[in-house]
């Protein structure tokens, strides 16, 4: 959902097309993301719960695709949103009102390092052997008042 807001999914201006012999490498890509130089996410595409072929097969049964369509999937661990046992206990408590749950959730999330204006996000995707290297994508978070 969050990737669908305007400006929330920077992509391009280039599209990397794999050579046929490089297609197997999509199952061994290192995915790294830093915020202000601090590594926040580090994973490998081999850890995906649903592989690209499975995802494309399932989605193509539900919708049509056109050349250039961008398919967004999940994310690697390390995002700011965190739910611990206490959070789950609060959210699943049927005695607590919906409004109180939201208030408690928001309050407990304040300690997490969400993005702020001025933060610099840098990400890289490349195969372990270096055959595929998508370069570096760097963006500065701008706060709009």
Language-model segments: residues:
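Beta-rich strand-turn-strand
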Residues: 62-72
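Glycine-enriched loop-and-adjacent helix/strand subsegments that border the catalytic/binding cleft
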Residues: 1-58, 62, 94-105, 110-119, ...
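Low-complexity, intrinsically disordered Gly/Pro/Thr-rich segments
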Residues: 118-128
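Short, Lys/Arg- and Gly-enriched loop/turn segments at beta-strand edges
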Residues: 79-86, 105-108, 128-139
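Residue-level signal for inorganic ion chemistry
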Residues: 11, 68, 125
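Glycine-rich, small/acidic residue-mixed loop/short-helix segments
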Residues: 87, 91-92
């Amino acid at each position: 959902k969050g990737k669908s807001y305007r400006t929330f999914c920077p992509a391009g201006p280039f599209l990397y097309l794999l050579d046929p012999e490089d297609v197997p490498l999509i199952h061994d890509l290192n995915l790294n993301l830093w915020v202000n130089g601090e590594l926040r996410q580090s994973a490998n595409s081999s850890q995906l719960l649903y592989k690209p072929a499975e995802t494309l097969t399932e989605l193509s049964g539900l919708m049509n695709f056109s050349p250039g369509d961008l398919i967004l999937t999940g994310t690697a661990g390390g995002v700011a949103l965190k739910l611990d046992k206490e959070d789950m206990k609060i959210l699943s408590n049927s005695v607590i009102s919906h409004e109180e749950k939201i208030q408690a959730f928001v309050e407990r999330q304040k300690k997490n390092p969400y993005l702020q204006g001025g933060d610099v996000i840098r990400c890289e995707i490349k195969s372990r052997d270096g055959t595929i290297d998508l370069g570096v994508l760097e963006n500065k978070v701008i706060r709009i008042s």
